[in-house]
Amino acid sequence: MGSEKQYIDLYRETAGMIKSHSADVLNGVRDKAFEDFCRQGFPSRKVERYRYTDMSKLFEPDYGLNLNRLEIPINPYEAFKCDVPNLSTSLYFVVNDAFYTKQLPKTELPDGVIVDSLCRVATENPGLIERYYARMAKTEDDAITALNTMLAQDGLLVYVPKNVKLDRAVQVINILRSDVDLMVNRRVLIILEQGAEAKFLFCDDSADDRHFLTTQVIEAYVGENASLDLYCLEETHVKNTRVSNVYIAQQAYSRVNHNVITLHNGVTRNKLDLVFKGEGAECFANGCVIADKTQRVDNNTLIDHQVPHCTSNELYKYVLDDDAVGAFAGRVLVRHDAQKTNSQETNNNLVAAKTARMYTQPELEIYADDVKCAHGCTVGQLNDAAMFYMRQRGISEKEAKLLLEFAFVNEVIDKMELAPLRERLHILVEKRFRGELNKCEGCRLCK
């Protein structure tokens, strides 16, 4: 037994404390998650979905945990100024793994919409949480999900009732704040009832230069004819390790637009599991990764077509420089009954240095005979002819490289449907390529 032993011993010693600062609904699945974690341990690189990242090594250091739920001395509404210009949002904060409730946004939400702490809603309406919490994120199938379920003491709930359409995007800023190296276990539950529409922007930022280890589990339930836009933007620092598992279930004729953007990080491992539960649904999964120095980004996706007449489109692009390492493994599963499936999976990668490495593994697993599916990947370097053309016209080598890299990732950015966010990302990406963006540039906490 390797690094998992410290977490097993930790839970045995502190289970009572963990449960005393949480809700019964979360505690109800905690012991099973512990048993599942003990049985599985951290996945080795022999496990297919984890072959590109050594999870045991990531969890080996001894991080602190705030199990007593000590208050973090911070008012993010005063300190954080990193808003996206012209994007009107309902702004909320999660400090480490706690929903910040002392000051909530003044914008009014439609009747019945809930954006609140999981534990608080679980106390007032436990039935709502019980119907969805840990139903899709099964602890017996994934050790990281089991560890998160075992240790998470609170989380964020977003609930949008039937036929309610949110005019404003919900923006959630996840801030890491600590005076010591810290492990954070974050949980998010999103529920969109039939006909509901909502857009969410999750921004991961760090207020301190400590070492952070974050596990995150997001469960999103998208009802019939509902529409979910989910944007996940990471701008942390090189001392940050982030392991995120996202689970999405789509009912008939629903639509999901999932976007993950990694602009600055240390080590990032993202997993997306999306399943079609009803006919006529469609999803778009896009990813943009910019990594240099010794940064590492691993995206792993599974699109599960269980029913007929559904459409999925994936596009992930990486730009790697210096000694950065990237990995993409995408599997599209088309089951026997999923006739008339339409699926496209693409992973294109630009390796700008000889010392950078990219691993790519797109897969199609098809058991139906009336489908339209395709997948492909490319790994290449900067176009010498294009570089030569620009150099002849007086453009410096550095500027020419920047223009080619920016044009390469622009296809993904242009798919962002929130126009102000799209425009802001154009600026951030250019700054990132110029080396001017080391972490969130608009937060006064960053010193």
Q: What are the roles of these predicted feature ranges?
A:
Residues A400:
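Extracellular glycan-modifying ectodomains
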Residues D111-D116, E124-I395, V409, I413-K447:
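Conserved beta-strand/loop scaffold segments within soluble protein domains that form the structured core
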Residues M1-A146, L315, D321:
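N-terminal amphipathic, basic helical "cap/leader" segment at the start of enzyme domains
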